[in-house]
Amino acid sequence: MSDQPVNTPELRPVLPFSFARAQQILLLQDESVTVAEVVCVPDTPALALLEARRVAGVPLAVSQVSPEEFERQLVMRYQRDSEEARRLMEDIGNDIDFYTLAEELPDSDDLLDGEDDAPIIRLINAMLTEAIKHKASDIHIETFERHLLIRFRIDGVLREILRPQRQLASLLVSRIKVMAKLDIAEKRVPQDGRMALRIGGRAIDVRVSTLPSNYGERVVLRLLDKNSVRLDLEALGMAEHNRRQLDTLIHRPHGIILVTGPTGSGKSTTLYAALSRLNSAERNIMTVEDPIEYELEGIGQTQVNPKVDMTFARGLRAILRQDPDVVLVGEIRDGETAQIAVQASLTGHLVLSTLHTNSALGALSRLQDMGIEPFLLSTSLLGVLAQRLVRTLCPSCRQPYVINDEQAQQTGLAAGTTLYHPGGCEKCNYSGYRGRTGIHELLLIDDTVRTAIHHGESELGIARMLGDKRITIRQDGLDKVLAGVTTWEEVVRVTKEE
């Protein structure tokens, strides 16, 4: 007997997972069933060893290991289905009824208790298919004391989809963790992973995040449908004057262009659209991202990795030694990255990046708070695009109405103006909205603004100086309200800070 882990990957576990875990015994056999090995702990019952001998039908080679090593072996061996599950999901069809499957699943305490994991795999297939059908960006699987809740984020808003059996929580979470190659035995710490799937012929990238909670693990799946996004400036919903000005900015030879907004406001899509416009054989375009969301042909993309100290700052330094013309930094999070980005722009590079600020003018204050001197900021910054995403009205069921005096006062429009509000039909799943579009504010750093920044003018001072020349996000949104693209309530929802 030894305490060394068995290292025979060609052997597969034979006993049901529930028995193996309860009795702390692993029976491993090859396809020819001529070789049988047992991995157990010193306290494994003799009856369990006899049962393993009976099932194997051949002599056993027994290895004793520590409880910790046994747990590791157990998880590793019973993750046998990870590749099989991936193959099962290689091309998920559209004929699976998510709701019926959830009702029909048998009760079970653990994903691997039975011989067949197919029902839970089918449920996950159906859940993913349903999410893609509704163009959901995220799936939330949340465990509470008395129920399990599945919600989809559709057009930026969470919607409850299903409340399946509470007992399904561990099955769903465990299977998803297996598919994302996470540690199913570790439930005390958050884990992150990803998987690539094909659903209805579409390539879907899924980012998986787990988080321990008081009633079990919560899981969020971020879905990235690589076929659904048009990476060009014309598809962003920009007003024509903003699009033309941004197009001019990104063709400047050097300087910094920033895109600001909260998480989920479409900043990455805007930057990728800009890179797609610039992408040519005459330019060396390089990125450092967290993570790489879209793979762009002809562009060198690097992903940050904190585990090996591959930060934005370190990646940016390395990129600048690769003779780039255009550099994309996924996000400026700290003063070090900001300083390197500014220096890069001053030495002949065009730098594109994002900041988490609510407005375009807020980017000026944020960079100065990070230690960028006003004279450097005024010299390097070309422009700042602030943006939000609003839901667009379903054109099949939107309904016109005439605003009253109170609504006129709220919107600043004339009483009697015709606007639209959501209806509800089969095409929009009775929500009244279908898809999203951007609303924007583009701050151009012209000579007037540059001088104000250089002299340390405040954010409020620059706003007053610009006056009516500044078209805010809310004003841009109001133009889309007048055009019947969205509603005033949607614009207010995403611009409350203004």
From Swiss-Prot:
- Report the superkingdom from the record: Bacteria
Record keyword Repressor present: no
Biological process (GO), any one: protein processing
Q: Which GO terms describe its cellular component?
A: plasma membrane; type II protein secretion system complex
Gene3D superfamilies, from UniProt? Answer: 3.30.450.90, P-loop containing nucleotide triphosphate hydrolases, Type II secretion system, protein E, N-terminal domain
The record's subcellular location field reads: Cell inner membrane
Which SMART domains does its entry note?
Answer: AAA
Which Pfam families does the protein's record reference? GSPE_N1E, T2SSE
Question: EC annotation?
Answer: 7.4.2.8
Q: What is its main location?
A: membrane
Phylogenetic classification of the source organism: Bacteria, Pseudomonadati, Pseudomonadota, Gammaproteobacteria, Enterobacterales
Q: Which reaction does this enzyme catalyse, per its entry?
A: ATP + H2O + cellular proteinSide 1 = ADP + phosphate + cellular proteinSide 2
- Per UniProt, where does Zn(2+) bind? C394, C397, C425, C428
The record describes its quaternary structure and partners as: Forms homooligomers; most probably hexamers. Interacts with OutL/GspL.
Protein known as: Type II secretion system protein E
Q: According to its UniProt entry, what is the function of this protein?
A: ATPase component of the type II secretion system required for the energy-dependent secretion of extracellular factors such as proteases and toxins from the periplasm. Acts as a molecular motor to provide the energy that is required for assembly of the pseudopilus and the extrusion of substrates generated in the cytoplasm.
What family is this protein classified in?
A: Belongs to the GSP E family.
